[in-house]
């Protein structure tokens, strides 16, 4: 069994790391022929041959994978290592910040009000030494009055000092008795280092400045507190010690130096900030005390930055962040103050509230206007061109957006509500559908399960032009439709009902394959259950084939591929399947899920099997509908018949349509007067999945419109009237007027032309296709304006409109009615008639090219060399020349060339041979030439004769 095993060649290629060409060529050299197809299969023996030959490639691939894996691991290891280093740095930084924050917290807590006041008193007498803040604590119990006097002399602080001293006495007692409490309170610990330094240094400083302060020795008992804060001293000691080495008895007391720098601490107190080192919160003594010492204190503080400045910074940063509630309260109070609430009269309050209400109303109106500018009001099924005009964006961008969403559209193709919303949202617009109330007025009755019966499938035949769509339907219907079609191509949707030999029914829609009928193909895909894509086996996957496939996929319709013309000698169905596989469309023969069948529409080969596959697909879909209700469906096509009036081809999808029903389709309404099938036979009723032609509507409904049947004629007329009004409003909104930018562009272009066209056709789909194709022909230099299009014969109104707007009239399968022809002859209006869309497009393109200004091209006719110069009075200089090349014409323009440089460009006055005027002189003959307005000629100058030729410009 292992020998029988087969392997797909694409799997082998991946495993051996070789290309398809190498594998095929090598096996071919070995005498083994296989298809150059990645989905082909090979046996184990063939695989072994390839493996033995290309084992090295496989090894190289594995080696490259290993190298790549090693590099990846190295990069990953480096990345992890870098992340680890960054994380370590971050943690170290966080720990350092936490330590600083702890110190700051102590400094903040260390700001009891009592200690701050104590520091201020001694500092004022001693302007130089930082021991003074300690002295403030010492005079607590000794002499409050003595400290006041020196303070008053230096700065006016006597008043705050007295209460400070009394407070300090209170502080001393708990500090001395309970050292544990001091430890618990970080504020006291921050203060006590300063106090411990002060006792000895204070005595010396006081002795120098004021003898009265000598009594401060009593506060030496606070040395115990300073021992508490030795860790803080350790940080500051190294830098403070060198500053004041000469203080006796203060060897340990680096705090003295510390205090020296500490003088900067008052500086933050000056603006009212708390003093971190001393912890003095009261603001009055601090600012006064700082004034004399500000200069020295700043320098000292800068030198001791690592020590004391850090102590100062916490004091500033230590401000407690206000809570959210406090912030809200503060904002409210500020607003109340600004608005003056509470202090004004009721009348003022009333006026203020009135102004506020008016301002709020104005803001709301402005906001509504701004939002409204981004909201577009549309009816459902607006064309791509109309939505582009409403949003003021180029049509190409809208089409590009639709294509990016997987929707193939053209400029005149109408979009449904969902697509409109998505496209508008891409450009930042909101869509408001103004027909919602109308749609809601049409009641939709939900069907019960027991009322549903199986219905025939609706099948759309799509594909490229001339690939055999209509021929396939001909064979199925046993009727030659192609013979009656212009140019052998379908130019509108044909709807046919077919009953097979086994009694089963299928409704077929035949869509055009020409590129102009994109919208008609899309419409066919929207109303269908199954799509048959016809592809010629002797051709390729053409653009319209791809377009039809995309339409079917967008509509979510099952696809069946019919590969036609397999009876031709150059047919290659496998090539078509290969191309489909390249588009990610695998047919069943190639292991996919999409059905396909090889047929010949001409001989009928495979058509029966194709229909069986259609019925199988329909059985899987389980198509059901309720025939016992008011009919609903879609308008497939509409046209004006000379004898019958407006005829609409419709496809009933739900319910049953009967003669006498009142029908509404788009903005048109009317009673069903007669119904016919595709062969012209009268039909009394039309059930689900039945295509019929209906007489009775008051106009040509737009293809793709939904139709509904109403019991109340009045209700249908009201809805039709409302729809007409909305469509008129929309046509006004989408009417594009010329802008200043466009005028400027046309002036800059210089030769801008416009071609106005009035388009009339026999069916709505053909008019739509022609309009779309004509609009695509517009260029920057020539623009086509379709000022009116419609279904029906050319009328006098059309001729008058063409006369007023200087337009041409194009009739597609229609002729002038009544006196329209005579009026057109009188007004000299050009009317063109066409029955093939190709011819209409080509003629219009030629007309546009004729409107373009021709390009002028110079052609050199000949050259003549001046051999002699004759000067004649009252005439000027005559050049005696010999024609050296070509010929010189009397009417040609000339250039005088001297030493390869053009010195004059002009015209001839006279061309003579001997004494006779001649029209031309050919090569080898001499002649006399007089140049208009130029006598500065010299011997050996060359006269070059040329003329300008107008070349017809082509459309870009």
Curated annotation (Swiss-Prot):
Q: Where found in the cell?
A: Cytoplasm
Its keywords, alphabetically, are:
Cytoplasm, GTP-binding, Initiation factor, Nucleotide-binding, Protein biosynthesis
What is the gene called? infB
Q: Which PANTHER family does the record cross-reference, listed alphabetically?
A: TR-TYPE G DOMAIN-CONTAINING PROTEIN, TRANSLATION INITIATION FACTOR IF-2-RELATED
Say which family it is in: Belongs to the TRAFAC class translation factor GTPase superfamily. Classic translation factor GTPase family. IF-2 subfamily.
UniProt feature, compositional bias: Basic and acidic residues:
58-102, 166-186, 353-371
Record-level Gene Ontology MF annotations = GTP binding; GTPase activity; translation initiation factor activity
Output compositional bias ranges, type Low complexity.
Answer: 197-208, 240-257
G5: region residues:
600-602
Q: tr-type G domain: which residues? A: 454-622
| Binding positions for GTP per the UniProt entry | 463-470, 510-514, 564-567
- Residue ranges for the region (G1) are 463-470
**What's this protein's name?**
Translation initiation factor IF-2
**Biased composition range(s): Basic residues:** 343-352
Report the protein's function: One of the essential components for the initiation of protein synthesis. Protects formylmethionyl-tRNA from spontaneous hydrolysis and promotes its binding to the 30S ribosomal subunits. Also involved in the hydrolysis of GTP during the formation of the 70S ribosomal complex.
| Region named G4 | 564-567
Q: Does the keyword Cell inner membrane apply?
A: no
Region: G3; residue ranges are 510-513
């Amino acid at each position: 069994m292992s020998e029988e095993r087969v392997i797909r060649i694409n799997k082998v290629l991946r495993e051996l790391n070789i290309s398809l060409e190498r594998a095929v060529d090598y096996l071919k050299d070995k005498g083994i022929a296989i298809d150059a197809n990645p989905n082909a299969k090979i046996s184990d023996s063939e695989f072994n041959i390839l493996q033995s030959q290309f084992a090295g490639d496989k090894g190289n691939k594995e080696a490259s994978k290993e190298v790549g894996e090693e590099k990846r691991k190295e990069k990953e290891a480096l990345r992890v290592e870098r992340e680890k280093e960054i994380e370590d740095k971050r943690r170290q930084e966080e720990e350092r910040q936490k330590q600083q924050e702890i110190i700051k917290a102590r400094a903040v807590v260390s700001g009891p009000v009592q200690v701050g006041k104590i520091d201020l008193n001694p500092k004022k007498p001693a302007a130089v030494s930082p021991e003074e803040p300690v002295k403030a604590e010492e005079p607590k119990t000794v002499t409050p009055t003595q400290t006041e006097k020196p303070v008053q002399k230096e700065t006016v602080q006597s008043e705050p000092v007295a209460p400070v001293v009394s407070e300090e006495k209170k502080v001393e007692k708990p500090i001395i008795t309970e050292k544990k409490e001091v430890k618990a309170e970080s504020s006291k610990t921050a203060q006590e280092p300063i106090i411990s330094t002060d006792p000895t240094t204070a005595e010396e400083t006081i002795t120098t400045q004021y003898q009265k302060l000598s009594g401060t020795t009593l506060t030496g008992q606070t040395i115990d507190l300073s021992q508490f804060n030795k860790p803080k001293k350790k940080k500051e000691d190294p830098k403070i010690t060198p500053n004041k080495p000469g203080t006796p008895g203060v060897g340990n007391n680096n705090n003295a130096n510390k205090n020296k720098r500490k003088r900067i601490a008052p500086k933050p107190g000056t603006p009212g900030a708390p003093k971190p080192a001393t912890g003095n919160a009261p603001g009055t003594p601090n600012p006064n005390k700082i004034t004399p010492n500000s200069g020295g204190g700043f320098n000292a503080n800068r030198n001791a930055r690592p020590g004391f400045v850090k102590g100062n910074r916490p004091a500033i940063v230590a401000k407690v962040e206000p809570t959210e509630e406090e912030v809200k309260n503060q904002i409210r109070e500020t607003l109340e103050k600004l608005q003056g609430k509470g202090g004004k009269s009721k009348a003022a309050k009333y006026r203020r509230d009135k102004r506020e209400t008016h301002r709020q109303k104005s803001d709301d109106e402005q906001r509504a206007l701004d939002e409204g500018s981004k909201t577009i009001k549309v009816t459902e099924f607006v064309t791509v061109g109309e939505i582009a005009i409403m949003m003021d964006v180029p049509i190409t961008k809208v089409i590009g957006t639709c294509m990016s969403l997987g929707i193939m559209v053209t400029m005149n193709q109408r979009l449904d509500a969902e697509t409109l919303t998505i496209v508008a949202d891409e450009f930042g617009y909101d869509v408001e559908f103004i027909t919602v109330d109308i749609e809601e007025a049409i009641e939709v009755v939900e069907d019960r399960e027991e009322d549903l019966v199986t219905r025939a499938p609706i099948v759309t035949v799509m594909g490229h032009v001339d690939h055999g769509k209509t021929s396939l339907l001909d064979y199925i219907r046993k009727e030659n439709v192609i013979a009656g079609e212009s140019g052998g191509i379908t130019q509108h949707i044909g709807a046919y009902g077919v009953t097979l030999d086994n009694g089963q029914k299928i409704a077929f829609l035949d869509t055009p394959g020409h590129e102009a009928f994109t919208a008609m193909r899309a419409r066919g895909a929207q109303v269908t259950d199954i799509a048959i894509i016809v592809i010629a086996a002797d051709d390729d996957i053409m653009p319209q084939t791809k377009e039809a496939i995309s339409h079917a996929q967008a509509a979510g319709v099952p696809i069946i591929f019919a590969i036609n013309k397999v009876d031709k000698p150059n047919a290659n169905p496998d090539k078509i399947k290969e191309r489909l596989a390249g588009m990610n469309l695998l047919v069943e023969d190639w292991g996919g899920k999409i059905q396909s069948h090889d047929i010949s529409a001409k001989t009928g080969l495979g058509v029966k099997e194709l229909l069986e596959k259609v019925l199988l697909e329909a059985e899987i879909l389980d198509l059901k509908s309720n025939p016992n209700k008011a009919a609903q469906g879609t308008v497939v096509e509409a046209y004006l018949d000379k004898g019958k009036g407006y005829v609409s081809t419709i496809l009933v999808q739900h319910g049953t349509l009967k003669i006498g029903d009142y029908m509404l389709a788009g903005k048109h309404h009317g009673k069903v007067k007669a119904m016919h099938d595709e062969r012209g036979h009268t039909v009394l009723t039309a059930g689900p999945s039945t295509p019929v032609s209906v007489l009775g509507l008051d106009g040509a409904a737009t293809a793709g419109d939904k139709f509904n049947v109403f019991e109340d004629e009045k209700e249908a007329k009201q809805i039709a009237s409302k729809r007409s009004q909305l469509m008129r409003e929309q046509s006004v909104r989408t009417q594009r007027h010329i802008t200043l930018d466009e005028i400027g562009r046309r002036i800059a272009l210089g030769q801008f032309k416009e071609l106005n066209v009035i388009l009339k056709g026999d069916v709505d789909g053909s008019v739509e296709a022609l309009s779309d194709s004509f609009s695509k022909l517009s260029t920057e230099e020539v623009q086509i304006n379709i000022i009116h299009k419609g279904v029906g014969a050319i009328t006098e109104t059309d001729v008058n409109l063409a006369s007023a707007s200087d337009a041409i009239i194009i009739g597609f399968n229609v002729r002038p009615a009544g006196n329209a022809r005579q009026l057109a002859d009188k007004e000299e209006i050009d009317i063109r008639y066409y029955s093939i869309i190709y011819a209409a497009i080509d003629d219009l393109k030629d007309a546009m090219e004729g409107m373009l200004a021709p390009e002028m091209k110079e052609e050199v006719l000949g050259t003549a060399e001046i051999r002699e110069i004759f000067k004649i009075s009252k005439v000027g200089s005559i050049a005696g020349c010999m024609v050296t090349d070509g010929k010189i014409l009397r009417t040609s323009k000339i250039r005088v060339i001297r030493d390869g440089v053009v010195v004059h460009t002009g015209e001839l006055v006279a061309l003579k041979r001997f004494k006779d005027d001649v029209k031309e002189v050919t090569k080898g003959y001499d002649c006399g030439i007089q140049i208009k307005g130029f006598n500065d000629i010299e011997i050996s100058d060359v006269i070059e004769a040329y003329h300008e030729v107008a070349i017809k410009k082509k459309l870009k």
